[in-house]
Amino acid sequence: MADPEKQGPAESRAEDEVMEGAQGGEDAATGDSATAPAAEEPQAPAENAPKPKNDFIESLPNPVKCRVLALKKLQKRCDKIEAKFDKEFQALEKKYNDIYKPLLAKIQELTGEMEGCAWTLEGEDDEDDEEEEDEEEEEEEAAAGATGGPDSAEK
């Protein structure tokens, strides 16, 4: 694929389109805004500074540049399709939500509020009493600790 003589006509046309976009075609206006200021600023030679994105792409061989730019175009197309899918999916959800509303209202009407139960579990009352006693003891300890009573010094 790297050799232009071995490429088919479709591949060479795609490369031509991509190269036109890279050289200021229709995609130049919609390109990354981050790369534009980097091209305008003068480059100071710094050994430890990372190369800007633009220099990295320029350092690649032409066939690789073409592939990168073609992949960028394809990704933009995928993003547009995905946005369209999301929009249609939301519309579909809204449509079926409207259909479900009457059914959900009937279910809510039938179930209504929880009705009281005449019976209780055997150990349920004992557990409630123990929990209340524990809470009261904790409150007393907290109150004694806050006032600095004799109980707080012992613990």
Curated annotation (Swiss-Prot):
Main location: nucleus
GO biological process: one example: nucleosome assembly
Subcellular location: Nucleus
Ranges of biased composition (kind: Low complexity): 27-49
GO cellular component, one term: nucleus
UniProt feature, compositional bias: Basic and acidic residues: 1-16
Region feature Disordered, mapped onto this chain: 1-60, 119-155
InterPro entries in alphabetical order: NAP-like_sf, NAP_family
Key words of the record: Coiled coil, Nucleus
Biased composition (Acidic residues): 122-142
Coiled-coil regions, chain positions: 68-94
Entry keyword annotation includes Coiled coil: yes
Family of this protein: Belongs to the nucleosome assembly protein (NAP) family.
Name of the protein in question: Nucleosome assembly protein 1-like 5
